Amino acid sequence: MSRVVIKCGGRVVRGSAAAILTLADAGHEVCVVHGAGPQISEEMERFGIPVEFVGGRRVTTAAGLAVVRSSFAAVNRALCAELGPRAVGLLGDEIGLHALQLPELGLVGEPLPSRPKAVLEALDSGLIPVVAPLGVGPLNVNADEAAAALAVGLEAERLLFVTDVAGVFRDGVVLSSIEAGEADRLLDDGTFEGGIVPKLRAAIAAARNGVRAEIGETAVVA
């Protein structure tokens, strides 16, 4: 069976367990990467920490990173509890998810293709690694980018983005597929904006490295 990386956004984490377990029960090796965007923003606002994004990445100070880490840990525990005894919770910075720091954004990193031993051992044991997207440093890492980096590093066959939208929309219609070059062009001219942007960029990177990437119902092909 194939190796699959599933990225679950913070808004849909609690509703993702059934889809994850269905793939695992079918014999696929499943690695999960989760976000926690809404939870992090809520906590940052509670502590009076400014919430700012640049190109889909969260500007992160030392105080912000503490909130990011605690929020990721809480979401990770909740998702593992929902998945049951096969789930193994992992924090990316503790297992060797490497990233290049982007100093202009603070304690933020651009993840590099990684093949963490802890993830491989979990998969080999028939378990489901559930990874919080922190990079070695520690650095805050965009969850979409982290999922793509792991998919490439783990040589996964598929990268699935589970979101609260049906897929990539253009002119009000969900696309069944989009070619990476066309997606690049539309991103550059501003056709796409908001949360779909980092997902598309991550899917493009994965597709160009041999991974079949899907955002909801939309396949992104190299």
Question: What annotation goes with each model-predicted range?
Answer:
Residues M1-A222:
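C-terminal catalytic "cap/lid" subdomain
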